[in-house]
């Protein structure tokens, strides 16, 4: 699930993933929420897990964060502290978009290039693509940290280490 949070209007997304949503699923998907916590009804998601309507879930955004539902955290395959957009690439892109919006607002129409820092090791040697991807980011590490100490949600998020996205690397077997 990746959608903005819209509370009112013709197409609200608040609790978009609710009991009705999960009941309508034809297969048992792996449910991923990386948008806004309130787009998913936590209790409906837990019931969907109980009923086998979904195979498993990966949650990066939570209702009521930083006070996250501990039952859901413990039942998630992967649970992270709202860090999906925390890569150096994501931050550079957001900075560029902000600069361009400000430039447009003031009638300057500037085009900006904001480059993230180079990764410490640009070439990744791995036997498979999965192994290569896990070497640059393993979500189970973040999940373990959050599950070990959920009260540190904001600390884990605030002190998040710099990482680059896949396109910053060259993979070789």
Model-derived features with residue positions:
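Short, conserved clusters of charged catalytic residues that mark active-site
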Residues: 16-17, 40
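Structural detector for helix-capping/boundary residues
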Residues: 19-20, 43
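Short secondary-structure boundary/capping segments
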Residues: 21-23, 69-70
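Rossmann-like NAD(P)-binding element
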Residues: 1-16, 22-33
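Rossmann-like dinucleotide-binding domain for NAD(H)/NADP(H)
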Residues: 28-173
């Amino acid at each position: 699930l990746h959608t903005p949070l819209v509370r009112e209007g013709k197409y609200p997304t608040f609790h978009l993933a609710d009991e009705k949503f999960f009941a309508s699923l034809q297969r048992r998907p792996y449910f991923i929420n990386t948008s806004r916590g309130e787009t998913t009804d936590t209790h409906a998601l837990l019931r969907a897990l109980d009923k086998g309507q979904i195979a498993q879930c990966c949650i990066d955004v939570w209702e009521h964060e930083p006070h996250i539902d501990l039952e859901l955290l413990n039942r998630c395959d992967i649970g992270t502290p709202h860090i999906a957009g925390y890569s150096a690439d994501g931050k550079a892109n957001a900075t560029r978009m902000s600069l361009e919006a400000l430039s447009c607002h003031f009638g300057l129409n500037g085009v900006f290039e904001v480059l993230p820092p180079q990764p410490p090791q640009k070439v990744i040697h791995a036997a498979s693509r999965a192994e290569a991807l896990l070497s640059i980011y393993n979500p189970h590490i973040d999940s373990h940290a959050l599950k070990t100490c959920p009260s540190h949600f904001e600390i884990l998020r605030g002190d998040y280490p710099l990482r680059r996205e896949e396109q910053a690397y060259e993979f070789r077997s």
